[in-house]
């Protein structure tokens, strides 16, 4: 039962765009972890600029105000290869769905 916490900057994601992000995350979880469609738990946080702080760049990656910080909690025991595949799948799907740079996706498992 994964729990996804999606953090975005207030005003950057309207209802339609956040729905695309949400759907992309759930699709990646279903595809990579094989979670059932009805295993769906997400919390979405829109934070004001003074509460959503990040560096403009780090280790060759550049971040815009479209950055999404995603925390996913699930029961341990999945192999490293599966976790890495999940990171890649989420990044690819969310970047395409939201129209953001792949750099603008920070994921913590």
Describe every region a protein language model picked out:
Residues 1-109:
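Interaction-mediating elements
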């Amino acid at each position: 039962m994964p729990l996804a916490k999606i953090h975005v900057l207030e005003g950057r994601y309207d209802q339609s765009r956040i729905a695309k992000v949400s759907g992309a995350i759930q699709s990646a979880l279903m595809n990579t972890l094989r979670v059932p469609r009805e295993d769906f738990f997400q919390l979405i946080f829109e934070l004001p600029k003074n509460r959503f702080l990040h560096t403009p760049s780090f280790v060759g990656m550049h971040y815009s105000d479209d950055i999404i910080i995603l925390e996913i909690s699930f029961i341990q025991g999945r192999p490293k290869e599966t976790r890495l595949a999940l990171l890649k799948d989420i990044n690819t799907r969310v970047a395409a769905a939201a129209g953001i740079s792949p750099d603008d996706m920070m994921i913590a498992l």
